Amino acid sequence: MRHYEIVFMVHPDQSEQVPGMIERYTGVITEANGKIHRLEDWGRRQLAYPIQDLHKAHYVLMNVEAPAETIEELETAFRFNDAVLRNMVMRTKVAVTEASPMAKAKDERDSRRGPAGDRSYDEANAEEIAE
């Protein structure tokens, strides 16, 4: 089996259907005795240029190990799913399991926020003023 990196972009109005799509696509891979090494839901992001008059899309990244027939089946599913705006499947030499730069940047932002990151600006300032 070969290793692949798959990225697909979903119409922003269909974002609530993304978990079901991920489940369906991962099911296709695991049924063919494939493995999912990395799965990242990047969420809704700004596009570099408009696609079908849209400026945002929901991104999903998957690194998988699967037979070529399974990847062809996934590409066909992407092609016939109107919610999928774009997809890209690239063959890789080895399995990629570490977090992507997108996920690392998100983790860094979350860690910098610290414990006050969940509170509103007014709550954090109210505590500082009270002290």
Curated annotation (Swiss-Prot):
A GO molecular-function descriptor: structural constituent of ribosome
Ranges of biased composition (kind: Basic and acidic residues): 104-122
Coiled coil: none
The keyword Ribonucleoprotein is assigned to this record: yes
A GO BP entry: translation
Function description: Binds together with bS18 to 16S ribosomal RNA.
Identification of the protein by name: Small ribosomal subunit protein bS6
